[in-house]
C-alpha cells in the first residue's frame, strides 16, 4: 500500500495551527491546537485539546507505509521491565482465510519498520497502574497533566466555576502527581499498550475532561482497509480521543495493523468478534484456547484496551427472556449462546484471572463489557442489566489485584429520568472505576437521528460522572457508517462531552464559548467559524446564501438581514445607552457647577492674564 493508493486527510483545521508544549524532558512534547483570532480584535489565540496527531501538522511528512512516529518507544524501553520476543506467527485464520487462500489486501511491513513485539519480563508489571501504585510518575503521566491543563492557570481567573460536579474531585490545576494518584486509586486509566508506542498519552476519568470514542470497522458486506484507516484519521481529526476497531469481516488482522501503526490515539477492540470469525461464526464452537490466542495476537499488535464480556453469567440470561429487545450486545449475545449451548458458565468469567495476567504483560486495559445492556428504553435499569453490573464490580477488583487498568461499559437505551441511577450504581458497585457509555439513547423513535437521541443522554450522563462517551452515528441501527457519518457522530459527541464539562464546572471549559460569543456579537464571522467544533460546516451554512467575501464583514446574516439582526440592534442600543449615560453625566456636572449658562471667570485666572500691550 502506498500514499497514492491510500488517501489520508492531512492539513490543519481552518484558522488553526499545531503547537507543542514541552515538559521536564525534551521528548515530552505535548501537541495542542491554537485557534488564531482576527488581528486587532484584542483577542488572544484560544488553545484547545487536540487528538489529530501528525496529520494536522504541516511540518510532519506522514508515510502511511511506515506508520506515525513512535512517541513513547524510548519511555517504554528505558523502564527496563519489558523484553522483545519473537511473537506468535501470523496465521491465515487471523484474517478469516481458509487453507490455501491468499490474503487480498496489502500487509503492513512490520519487519521493514523494525517492529518486534514486547511483553513483560518475568515477574514484572509494566502497567501504568503498577507504576502509579509504586509512586512513580511516568513521562506518560506528565504528558497527560500538561495536555489536560492547556492554559488553565491563565484562564481560571477569567472564568467562574459554577457547575455541579456530583461529588467529583476536579482540581483547579492538573499536576503529574494528581494524575498518578487518580490512576493509583483506579479512578482513571491511561490506555498505553507497550506495543503501541505511536499513541499520544491520554487519560479517562471523571475528574478529567470528558472523552469520546469513535467506532470504526469493516463488516462482512462493506468497507476496505483504505476506508477504515481513513476513518480513523478522520475521526481523530474531528476530536475522537480513542477509536475502537469493531471489524467483523475478512482481513481483520491486516486492517487492524494498518490502523494501529498509524493511530495517534489508543485503539480498542472486542476480541470475541475475531475469535468468532476463526470458528466460522459458530458461537458454540468457541473455546478458551481460541480466545486466548486471539488476545495474544491483538496484544502483540498494540491494542490498548479490550472489551471483555465476562459479566454475562448463565444465571442472568433467563432475566432477558421477557425483554422487549432481548440481548442487543453482539458480544453479549455470542457469550449467551455459548453458555446455553454448553450449559456452562461463561469461559471469560471462569478464566478471568488468566486474562488478567495476560493483559498485565502488555498493559492492555480492560473495558468490561455490558453484554446485557438495554437495547430499548422499555428494558432500561432492569434486573439483567444491574445484575451484570454487580458482577463487573467484582471483576474490577480482581483486575486491580493484578495491576490491570479497568473501565466499565454502560448503556445503551435509557430515558432521561433513569440516567442518574446508572451512574450512582456504577460508582457504588465498581469502586469509581471510569464509566464508559454508549449514549444512552433517551428515546427509540428516531432512526436516522440517533446521534441526536443519544447525545441528549450522553450530555446528561457525562454531567453525572461518566468519563468517556461512545459516539453514535446517524446510521445507528440502520447500516455501517461511512466517513461523513463518522464526522457527524464525532462532532455531535464532542458537543455532548463539552456540555458535560461546562455543567460540571470544569476549569477553563467556558473559555472557548465566551470567545465565540464575543466573536458573534462583534460580527467577526471567520472567528465564529474557526472557533466552532466544525468550522467547515459553519462556513458552508453561512455561505449558502451569502457567499461573497464581503459578507464575512457584514453586520448581519441571511436569517434576519440588515434591519432585523438582534445583535446589531443590541449594539445600537448599547451605543445609545452609552451616549445617554454620557449626557446624564454632563447634566449632573452642569447642575453641580451651579446650573449657570455663563460662568464668570475666576479672579485668580483674570490676575494671571498678561497685561495688554
From Swiss-Prot:
The gene is thiC. Binds 1 [4Fe-4S] cluster per subunit. The cluster is coordinated with 3 cysteines and an exchangeable S-adenosyl-L-methionine. GO terms for cellular component: cytosol. Zn(2+) binds at residues 413, 477. This is Phosphomethylpyrimidine synthase. Homodimer. One of its GO terms (biological process) is thiamine diphosphate biosynthetic process. Catalyzes the synthesis of the hydroxymethylpyrimidine phosphate (HMP-P) moiety of thiamine from aminoimidazole ribotide (AIR) in a radical S-adenosyl-L-methionine (SAM)-dependent reaction. [4Fe-4S] cluster binds at residues 557, 560, 565. It comes from Paramagnetospirillum magneticum (strain ATCC 700264 / AMB-1). Pathway: Cofactor biosynthesis; thiamine diphosphate biosynthesis. It catalyses: 5-amino-1-(5-phospho-beta-D-ribosyl)imidazole + S-adenosyl-L-methionine = 4-amino-2-methyl-5-(phosphooxymethyl)pyrimidine + CO + 5'-deoxyadenosine + formate + L-methionine + 3 H(+). Substrate binds at residues 215, 244, 273, 309, 329-331, 370-373, 409, 436. Belongs to the ThiC family. Its EC number is 4.1.99.17. The keyword Iron-sulfur applies. Keywords: 4Fe-4S, Iron, Iron-sulfur, Lyase, Metal-binding, S-adenosyl-L-methionine, Thiamine biosynthesis, Zinc. It holds the Pfam family ThiC-associated. InterPro entries: ThiC (IPR037509), ThiC-associated_dom (IPR025747), ThiC/Bza_core_dom (IPR038521), ThiC/BzaA/B (IPR002817). GO terms for molecular function: 4 iron, 4 sulfur cluster binding; carbon-carbon lyase activity; zinc ion binding.
Amino acid at each position: 500500500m502506498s500514499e497514492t493508493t491510500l488517501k489520508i486527510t492531512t492539513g490543519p483545521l481552518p484558522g488553526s495551527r499545531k503547537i507543542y508544549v514541552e515538559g521536564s524532558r525534551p521528548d515530552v512534547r505535548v501537541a495542542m491546537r491554537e485557534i488564531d483570532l482576527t488581528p486587532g480584535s484584542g483577542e488572544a489565540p484560544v488553545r484547545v485539546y487536540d487528538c489529530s496527531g501528525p496529520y494536522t501538522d504541516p511540518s510532519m511528512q506522514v508515510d502511511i507505509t511506515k506508520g506515525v512516529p513512535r512517541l513513547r518507544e524510548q519511555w517504554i524501553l528505558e523502564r527496563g521491565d519489558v523484553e522483545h520476543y519473537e511473537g506468535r506467527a501470523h496465521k491465515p485464520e487471523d484474517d478469516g482465510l481458509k487453507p490455501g487462500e491468499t490474503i487480498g489486501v496489502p500487509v503492513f511491513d512490520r519487519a521493514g519498520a523494525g517492529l518486534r513485539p514486547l511483553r513483560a519480563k518475568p515477574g514484572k508489571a509494566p502497567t501504568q497502574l503498577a507504576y502509579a501504585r509504586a509512586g512513580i510518575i511516568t513521562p506518560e503521566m506528565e504528558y497527560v497533566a500538561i495536555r489536560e491543563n492547556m492554559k488553565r492557570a491563565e484562564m481560571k481567573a477569567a472564568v467562574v466555576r459554577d457547575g455541579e460536579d456530583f461529588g467529583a474531585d476536579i482540581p483547579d490545576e492538573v499536576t503529574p502527581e494528581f494524575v498518578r494518584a487518580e490512576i493509583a486509586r483506579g479512578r482513571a486509566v491511561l490506555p498505553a499498550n507497550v506495543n503501541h508506542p505511536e499513541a499520544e498519552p491520554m487519560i479517562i476519568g471523571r475528574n478529567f475532561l470528558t472523552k469520546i470514542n469513535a467506532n470504526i470497522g469493516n463488516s462482512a458486506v462493506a468497507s476496505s482497509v483504505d476506508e477504515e484507516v481513513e476513518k480513523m484519521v478522520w475521526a481523530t481529526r474531528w476530536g475522537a480521543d480513542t477509536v475502537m476497531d469493531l471489524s467483523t469481516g475478512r482481513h481483520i488482522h491486516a486492517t487492524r495493523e494498518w490502523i494501529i501503526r498509524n493511530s495517534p490515539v489508543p485503539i480498542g477492540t472486542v476480541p470475541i468478534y475475531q475469535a468468532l470469525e476463526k470458528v466460522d461464526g459458530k458461537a458454540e464452537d468457541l473455546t478458551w484456547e481460541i480466545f486466548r490466542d486471539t488476545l495474544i495476537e491483538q496484544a502483540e499488535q498494540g491494542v490498548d484496551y479490550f472489551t471483555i464480556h465476562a459479566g454475562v453469567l448463565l444465571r442472568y440470561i433467563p432475566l432477558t427472556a421477557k425483554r422487549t429487545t432481548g440481548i442487543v450486545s453482539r458480544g453479549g449475545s455470542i457469550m449467551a449462546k455459548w453458555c446455553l449451548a454448553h450449559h456452562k458458565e461463561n469461559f471469560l468469567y471462569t478464566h478471568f484471572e488468566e486474562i488478567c495476567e495476560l493483559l498485565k504483560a502488555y498493559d492492555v486495559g480492560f473495558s468490561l463489557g455490558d453484554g446485557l445492556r438495554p437495547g430499548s428504553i422499555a428494558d432500561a435499569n432492569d434486573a439483567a442489566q444491574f445484575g451484570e453490573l454487580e458482577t463487573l464490580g467484582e471483576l474490577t477488583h480482581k483486575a486491580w489485584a493484578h495491576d490491570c487498568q479497568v473501565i466499565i461499559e454502560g448503556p445503551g437505551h435509557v430515558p432521561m429520568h433513569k440516567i442518574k441511577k446508572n451512574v450512582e450504581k456504577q460508582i457504588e458497585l465498581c469502586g469509581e472505576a471510569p464509566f464508559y457509555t454508549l449514549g444512552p439513547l433517551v428515546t427509540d423513535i428516531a432512526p436516522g437521528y440517533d446521534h441526536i437521541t443519544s447525545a441528549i443522554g450522553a450530555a446528561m450522563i457525562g454531567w453525572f460522572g461518566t468519563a468517556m462517551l461512545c459516539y453514535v452515528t446517524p446510521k445507528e441501527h440502520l447500516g455501517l457508517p461511512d466517513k461523513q457519518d463518522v464526522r457527524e457522530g464525532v462532532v455531535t459527541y464532542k458537543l455532548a462531552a463539552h456540555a458535560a464539562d461546562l455543567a460540571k464546572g470544569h476549569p477553563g471549559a467556558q473559555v472557548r464559548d465566551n470567545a465565540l460569543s464575543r466573536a458573534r456579537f462583534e460580527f467577526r464571522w471567520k472567528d465564529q467559524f474557526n472557533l466552532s467544533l466544525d468550522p467547515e460546516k459553519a462556513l458552508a451554512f453561512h455561505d449558502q446564501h451569502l457567499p461573497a467575501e464581503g459578507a464575512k464583514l457584514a453586520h448581519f446574516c441571511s436569517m434576519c438581514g440588515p434591519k432585523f439582526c438582534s445583535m446589531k440592534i443590541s449594539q445600537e442600543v448599547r451605543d445609545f445607552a452609552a451616549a445617554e449615560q454620557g449626557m446624564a453625566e454632563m447634566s449632573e456636572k452642569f447642575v453641580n457647577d451651579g446650573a449657570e449658562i455663563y460662568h464668570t471667570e475666576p479672579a485668580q485666572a483674570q490676575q494671571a492674564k498678561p497685561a495688554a500691550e
